[in-house]
A protein has these predicted regions:
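Alpha-helical transmembrane segments of integral membrane proteins
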Residues: 1-325
């Protein structure tokens, strides 16, 4: 895909928001038809709040860019709503149940509501496509385990992210775990370059933060742009955490394989570093090596964040039902 340009394409952002809401409706309909063991009315309210945030983000993006196009500036109400969505989305995420599909669905809605506010074109569709790919990956790994008779659980609906903390359910490493680790590294690189070469400063468009601020503030704008870059990484890391749970393998064991693959990549690019030729060739070879080394450290941070987002849940007081005698 080409680098995101400076000409905004808001209809694509609106289409991404509407597509997210459509997928959410189908997912909620499927959830309502599921067994009562995995459904709670209070949990459904959380999903409706998240869907409302996605719809609100879609409206704010459209309204803000129309206002800026008409030379009317950033509406104060849109700015307040944008910051409220940015703060409330992670909280709503942690209120959802920790069952595998329900938590992954909640992660998608929370991150999409933020990503839409930071999008100006086709990149708004990228998290949806990436999440669909992650969904297929998790199902594929579960089907592979069932084929070889290594999984004792027939349905992914039975998996809970909190099982990852139970050491009694861990198994030994297999050769297939190398494939899973390689896929994770491949998807991380895909998330890195999915919307263009983010190693280039030309890929960052200040128009992406116009829903939050229009006054030049380098630190604030830089932080928001880094958040936009990190969201696809979070999706991939959470999917990798789901793979670890479904395959009943310790997260540390599987992530050590990832680090070995990353070190091999870093060693390969280290031998490609040039100290001769044009300045462009020298700078490109050095930047490739630095990016791979930084990616290794960044994956460790993302792995810890994914464990937090998938296993933790904020408890709210539930209303008790009183029966009259």
């Amino acid at each position: 895909m080409p680098v995101v340009g400076r000409d905004p394409n808001i209809p694509l952002v609106i289409a991404a928001g509407l597509l997210t809401l459509l997928i959410s409706c189908f997912s909620l309909a499927s959830l309502c038809k599921s067994e009562n063991k995995y459904r709670d009315n209070e949990d459904l309210k959380v999903y409706f709040y998240q869907m409302f945030s996605v719809a609100l983000s879609t409206y704010v993006v459209s309204s803000t860019h129309n206002s800026l196009k008409n030379k009317q500036g950033l509406p104060v109400m849109n700015q307040i709503i944008s910051w409220m969505i940015l703060v409330s989305s992670p909280v709503l995420l942690l209120l959802s149940p920790t069952f595998l599909f329900q938590r992954l669905f909640s992660i998608l809605l929370s991150l999409m509501s933020i990503y839409l506010l930071l999008s100006t074109g086709y990149e708004a569709l990228f998290p949806l496509v990436l999440f669909g790919l992650m969904f297929v990956w998790v199902n594929m790994e579960q089907e592979a385990l069932q084929h070889y008779g290594l999984s004792r659980k027939p349905k992914l609906a039975f998996f809970n992210f909190t099982y990852a903390m139970d050491i009694t359910q861990f198994r030994q490493l297999h050769l297939d775990d190398i494939r899973r680790s390689f896929f994770f590294v491949f998807f991380i690189v895909t998330a890195f370059f999915g919307t263009g070469n983010i190693a280039s400063i030309n890929s960052f468009d200040p128009a992406s933060v116009y829903c939050f601020l229009t006054v030049f503030s380098p630190f604030m704008m830089g932080g928001l742009l880094l958040l936009k870059v990190a969201i696809p990484f979070v999706l991939v890391s959470c999917a990798f955490e789901a793979v670890q749970v479904t395959t009943q393998l310790s997260s540390k064991s599987l992530f050590l394989i990832v680090l070995v693959i990353s070190d091999i990549m870093a060693l390969y690019f280290f031998f490609l570093v040039k100290d001769y030729g044009s300045w462009l060739d020298i700078g490109t070879s050095i930047s490739h090596y630095v990016l791979v080394m930084s990616l290794t450290i960044f994956m460790m941070v993302m792995n810890g964040l994914a464990q937090l987002l998938t296993t933790q849940r904020l408890g709210l007081p539930r209303r008790t039902k009183h029966h009259s005698t």
